[in-house]
UniProtKB/Swiss-Prot annotation:
Heterohexamer composed of two FlhC and four FlhD subunits. Each FlhC binds a FlhD dimer, forming a heterotrimer, and a hexamer assembles by dimerization of two heterotrimers. Functions in complex with FlhD as a master transcriptional regulator that regulates transcription of several flagellar and non-flagellar operons by binding to their promoter region. Activates expression of class 2 flagellar genes, including fliA, which is a flagellum-specific sigma factor that turns on the class 3 genes. Also regulates genes whose products function in a variety of physiological pathways. It is found in: Cytoplasm. One of its GO terms (molecular function) is DNA binding. Keywords: Activator, Bacterial flagellum biogenesis, Cytoplasm, DNA-binding, Metal-binding, Transcription, Transcription regulation, Zinc. Zn(2+) binds at C149, C152, C169, C172. This is Flagellar transcriptional regulator FlhC. GO terms for cellular component: cytoplasm. It holds the Pfam family FlhC. One of its GO terms (biological process) is bacterial-type flagellum organization. It comes from Burkholderia lata (strain ATCC 17760 / DSM 23089 / LMG 22485 / NCIMB 9086 / R18194 / 383). Binds 1 zinc ion per subunit. Belongs to the FlhC family.
Amino acid sequence: MSGRAGRHGLADDAQLTMHAAALIRLGARLQMLEIECALPREHLVRLYREVRGVAAPKGLLPSSIDWYMTWLANIHASLFHNIYRFLRNQAGCPRLEALVKAYTLYAEQGDATRRALPLDLTRALPLDLTRAWMLVRFVDAGVLDIARCRDCGAAFITYRHALRRHPVCVACRLPARAGKRAVAAPQRATADTRHARRQDARTAVVACRDGSTTTGGASGERHAV
């Protein structure tokens, strides 16, 4: 028996396997599972294929802290980390359990918001599980920090050594074009519908002017009078 396996009993391994399966369903990468679950790599590879039905993807983990400073990513990252911090500090959840529950709640909130607003439901949430996990690690390592907005009092993600002494969150100082891309797809669909209606109206006007009637709908056949 290996040293890693000897440190866990069967009950501990079963619990770690359940946590790993939950993380895989949320989109965890294999590197993340190896660090958080402390299970043999071969076991995690088999578990990933069993849960997802495909082989685990390869590639480097995201390592940029600047990504979290863009306005949309910062809002989502701040929302997730507030949930995570509540589960850790107030609810007393262990780190791995808090990570799973926090991301699940964040994803549910994000899906509910996208259904309530005219947003593109086919697009993924800005903050995937890997970036959420890296956010927790960055904050724990002191690379990123939590600040309080001087206007609304909300806690948000910022640089550890930010130059602003009185920071303001992104929600209180949204950029001018914030949200334009989010509603672009519904707007394009509405524009296409308006264009089609204008074309149908032109067809009807031409039909009346030429002394003919239009039947069978907007794109129906013309019958001379």
